[in-house]
Design a protein with these regions (language model features):
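Pre-NBD coupling/linker segments of ABC/ABC-like ATPases
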Residues: 2-4
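ABC transporter nucleotide-binding domains
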Residues: 6-11, 16-215, 219-220
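A short, local hydrophobic-aromatic micro-motif
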Residues: 12, 61, 263-266, 300
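Hydrophobic/anchoring residues in structured secondary elements
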Residues: 16, 267-270, 304
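A generic structural signal for secondary-structure junctions
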Residues: 84, 101, 110, 149, ...
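ABC transporter nucleotide-binding domain
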Residues: 180-279
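C-terminal coupling/interaction segments
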Residues: 280-359
Length: 359
């Protein structure tokens, strides 16, 4: 019998090799019930391969994965009944209405016609799509298709939902609606959600934890504040400063040289809004403030970064790239990996159809 604190996804030493290419390399990961987990990484990092192994659609080279205690390779059919998959490009029958698409999905998952209609009506209201229920799916915008996609996934009452770029190509208001819905599915329904995405801002807003994937390896995993603190423990401190002189934000050679002269400063840059971003190997707040005040600058803002996922991702990614030193151990380097990536895309494109087959 499972409880709220049980792990829903457990991955142990999971690897997938294509010849010498390590698409996924010794992955260990645990995702809790009701957790929203963001999986970040560039194309070819191993995110899609990991998803395919979780869904039992490709066998691992080594290691294993379980979903709610079920072996993803040996018990893939049972896993399929627990998992809903939302691809980045949701496909529906364009000549059928949104309602009819959901009813069809419900029937494919073993519901009677009456049960399918009732559940479709309830879910369309839940995702805010009742107004478009009788419109043909082919007329839907991308945001509407994504919401219908979430509704389609919910028809089978999943315990886990795996989403691939759920907010890509959607306008800001649509993004807010979808991210709010995702958070509600975890908080109110207790559904475990794993999101694979490049959208760092949205991942930061809704995820309980994130994992950063680079070249087949999970190089960092944890809450965003934890990852920021880990960087500081490794000697990386980040600061944002707004400084003015004579009422204007400053960014001249004299100002830059003054900042660079502070012991420990490694990087100085300017954001679009005029905020100065500084990175250092130690905590320079006191020295920085003293230098600015003594040079007659007015300090409007100064705070230490640590919860900005964009900076965290960039730093971990740069560290992983430096460690690899240009080696071709993962990702999509080389002709073999290119061929493997093409194969994975073809398999991934069939996921929606596979998961609509139901029980």
């Amino acid at each position: 019998m499972t409880t709220k604190n049980d792990s829903m996804i457990t991955i142990t030493n999971l690897s997938k090799y294509y010849g010498e290419v390590k698409a996924v390399n010794h992955l260990d990961l645990e995702i809790k019930r009701g957790e929203v987990f963001g999986l970040l990484g560039p194309n070819g990092a191993g995110k899609t391969t990991t998803t395919l192994m979780l869904l039992g659609l490709t066998d691992p080279t080594a290691g294993h994965a379980t979903i709610d205690g079920l072996d993803c390779t040996k018990e893939s059919l049972a896993v399929k009944n627990k998992v809903g998959y939302l691809p980045d490009n949701v496909g529906f029958y364009p000549a059928m209405t949104g309602m009819d698409n959901l009813i069809f999905s419900g029937r494919m998952n073993g519901l009677s016609k009456e049960e399918a209609i009732k559940r479709a009506e309830e879910i369309l209201e839940r995702v805010g799509m009742t107004y478009a229920a009788d419109r043909k799916a082919g007329t839907y915008s991308r945001g509407m298709r994504q919401r219908l996609g979430i509704a389609d996934v919910l028809m089978k009452k999943p315990e886990i939902i795996i989403m691939d770029e759920p907010t890509a190509g959607i306008d800001p208001s649509g993004v807010r609606e979808i991210t709010t819905l995702i958070r509600e599915l975890a908080d109110k329904d207790g559904i475990t959600i794993m999101i694979s995405s490049h959208d760092l801002y949205q991942i930061q807003r809704i995820s309980d934890r994130v994992g950063i994937f680079v070249k087949g390896k999970l190089i960092a995993c944890g809450r965003i504040d934890e990852l920021g603190h880990q960087l500081m423990s490794k000697g990386l401190f980040m600061f944002d400063v707004v400084a003015e002189k004579n009422g204007e934000k400053v960014w001249n050679e004299e100002f830059q040289n003054m900042i660079r002269s502070i012991n420990g400063v490694t990087i100085i840059g300017r954001r679009v809004d005029g905020t100065v971003h500084i990175e250092a190997t130690r905590d320079i707040q006191k020295d920085l403030l003293k230098a600015l005040v003594e040079a007659d600058y007015t300090v409007r803002e100064m705070h230490q970064e640590g919860g900005d996922l964009t900076e965290i991702y960039r730093k971990y990614f740069e560290a992983a790239e430096a460690e690899e030193g240009g080696s071709h151990h993962g990702g999509d380097k080389g002709s073999t990996a290119e061929s493997s990536a093409d194969k994975l895309k073809k398999v991934a494109g069939r996921l929606t159809a596979v998961f609509k087959e139901g029980k």
